[in-house]
Amino acid sequence: MRTFGPKWFKQDSLIGEFSEHLGMAVTQHRQAIALQVAKVDAELASKAKSEFIANMSHELRTPLNAIIGFSDMLHIQTAISPEKVHQYSGYIKQAAEHLLALINGILDVSKIQAGELTVDREPLDLPALLSSCLLIIEAKAREKSIAVETAVSPGLPKILGDSLRVKQVLINLLGNAVKFTPERGRIRIEVAPLQRGYAAISVTDTGCGMSPSEVETAMRPFGQIDTAFNKRHEGTGLGLPIAYALARLHGGDLRIDSHKGAGTRVTVILPTIDSIDNQPDSHIH
């Protein structure tokens, strides 16, 4: 005599098996998507690094060729005037300083990615630091007839930071503004206190601007925006990622507001002496 179980038992078993298979299929699908995304990310990272190495090779060759060329001229020419010696040695010094800056940029990125870069925290006069940085870019701005405006809020408290690294951030932002602002353009620098122990330094230019995807690329180490305009300008693509990392190491932030064809505004936020009792990365407005 044959016996049969209840229909609801068979239905529950089928539903259970179906749910189990469906769950496995969903999991496998998610894993496949994750692997595909990881593969694409790895390929993009590899491509970016390859492009960076190719570009960096060109950047390194430029000052090296200048050093070798002017050194050869000093070595070959027997009857050379003191004025020429002074001129050539000046070119060699400039090229060597440029080469050192490139190498330091590579080392900084390596330290940042390895978590080995540290910053000091001491009271700093931000307007004085800004003035010294403006002197560095002044000649280039004048050469392009760029108007540079500054607006510093009175009574600004001292910031807490590493003098060398804060200057590195400011010089990068100012240098980029001059580089990407066309002749007879305008750059405006604003320094103002924020609430709860922070200060903001904003650099706004009337340059070519960036799309959201280009901003994302510019903030990525080894990422460079592939445009004809950028290819006409020297650069390693390390400046903004380093500046962002340094701002975060200080307990601050770096933000970019840019629109294609409408210029760029970069704001770096740094803690002031009022934030000594606050935790880094908190209460940032």
Which ranges hold each PLM region?
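Helix-loop junction within the histidine kinase core
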Residues: 110-121
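Short helix-loop "hinge" at the ATP-lid/N-box region of the Bergerat-fold HATPase_c
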Residues: 177-178
